[in-house]
């Protein structure tokens, strides 16, 4: 018998998450406590519920630039090794509680040195938090693997330095590199040196592209930078035409994106908040899934979007009528697209994801 697709049941399904920002996933209570501990006085509220409402409301801005503004508060309380360790630990705890079995969590080390820490110390603290979180989850009967992507800010000029950081930590839990931040005026090609360095070291990277900006951002990320994955990439829909009879025609950029199986790290709720799409029902996720792009489901910023992987999946189920086999496919897509070794990916797919979805599908 097929298990009903409720939030409770979806929460029991194994999930793989590729696009989640550490500084966008703090618990509101943790933000308050860290602010008190470290003397951060700029929070807009001193009540947990009011603070949660602030982050959620501020994120529903219709603009990527305005969506990013509340991050000043989360980053502001993440300036010590102890704070970074705690946030990383709780991140793993929260993801494991949602039955995420694999996650790549990203953050920008350059944003966490205001308290005097060096970049290496910042990464060390986060990786230690992830490792301790994994152990705690295992002790609670929930197995999860969390790896790290280090991100460079696209408006800054430290991307080569951050790419070198990724390579230094590649055997200690960092599996890739990313650039993030406001897209308009800061094309991916500003950071070619960093991407060339990653390729020269046989390393993997994803690029935020096609979120607030359009097709040129995606084209640069693929054609000139050589991205292994696209962070968001939702604007690829602008290169797809659907005729009145339902026939779908791909433009050349969309075609090569699909043909090369370049994964899309789609974040439905976040895309609505930033104005990239009007609503979940109007999100191109389903069009992209039906035309066999490699789509994945992601949270982006769990605090700002007040979301979990289970909630993202449920919203897609409600909008597009997906079943367990669809959710399994999206999860396998993510696992196939992860930056860990092939045999580790395969083990999670064959030993964890497929068997558990088979039970749910009846």
From Swiss-Prot:
Annotated residues for binding of Zn(2+): 19, 21, 208, 300
Pfam families from the UniProt entry: A_deaminase
Cofactor requirements of the protein: Zn(2+)
Residues at which substrate binds: 21, 23, 181
Active-site residues, as the UniProt record annotates them: 211
InterPro entries: A_deaminase (IPR028893), A_deaminase_dom (IPR001365), Ado/ade_deaminase (IPR006330), Metal_Hydrolase (IPR032466)
Signal peptide as annotated in the record: none
EC number: 3.5.4.4
Catalytic reactions of this protein: adenosine + H2O + H(+) = inosine + NH4(+); 2'-deoxyadenosine + H2O + H(+) = 2'-deoxyinosine + NH4(+)
Gene Ontology molecular function terms on file: 2'-deoxyadenosine deaminase activity; adenosine deaminase activity; zinc ion binding
Domain of life: Bacteria
A GO biological-process term: hypoxanthine salvage
Cofactor binding note from Swiss-Prot or TrEMBL: Binds 1 zinc ion per subunit.
Protein name per UniProt: Adenosine deaminase
Organism: Mycobacterium sp. (strain JLS)
Gene: add
């Amino acid at each position: 018998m097929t298990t009903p697709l409720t939030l409770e049941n979806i929460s029991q399904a194994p999930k793989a998450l590729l696009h989640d920002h550490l500084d966008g996933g703090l618990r509101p209570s943790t933000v308050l406590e860290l602010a008190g501990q470290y003397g951060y006085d700029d929070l807009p509220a001193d009540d947990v519920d009011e603070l949660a409402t602030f982050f959620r409301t501020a994120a529903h801005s219709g603009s990527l630039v305005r969506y990013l503004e509340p991050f000043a508060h989360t980053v502001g309380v993440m300036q010590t090794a102890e704070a970074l360790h705690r946030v990383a630990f709780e991140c793993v705890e929260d993801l494991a509680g949602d039955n995420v079995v694999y996650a790549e969590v990203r953050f920008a080390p350059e944003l966490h040195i205001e308290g005097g820490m060096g970049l290496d110390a910042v990464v060390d603290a986060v990786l230690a938090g992830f490792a301790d979180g994994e152990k705690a989850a295992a002790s609670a009967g929930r197995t999860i693997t969390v790896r790290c992507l280090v991100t460079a800010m696209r408006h800054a000029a430290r991307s080569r330095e951050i790419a070198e950081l990724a390579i230094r930590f590649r055997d200690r839990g960092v599996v890739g590199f990313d650039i993030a931040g406001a897209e308009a005026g800061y094309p991916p090609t500003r950071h070619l040196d960093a991407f060339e360095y990653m390729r020269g070291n046989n390393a993997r990277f994803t690029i935020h592209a096609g979120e607030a900006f359009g097709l040129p951002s995606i084209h640069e990320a693929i054609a000139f930078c050589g991205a292994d994955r696209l962070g968001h990439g939702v604007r690829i829909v602008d290169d797809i035409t659907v005729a009145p009879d339902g026939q779908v025609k791909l433009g050349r950029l969309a075609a090569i994106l699909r043909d090369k199986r370049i994964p899309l790290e789609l974040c439905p709720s976040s895309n609505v908040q930033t104005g990239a799409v009007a609503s979940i029902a109007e999100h191109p996720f389903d069009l992209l899934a039906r035309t066999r792009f490699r789509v994945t489901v992601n949270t982006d910023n769990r605090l700002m979007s007040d979301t979990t992987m289970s909630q993202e999946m449920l919203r897609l189920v409600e909008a597009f009528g997906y079943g367990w086999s669809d959710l399994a496919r999206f999860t396998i897509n993510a696992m196939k697209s992860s930056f860990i070794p092939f045999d580790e990916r395969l083990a999670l797919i064959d030993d964890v994801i497929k068997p558990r979805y088979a039970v749910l599908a009846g």
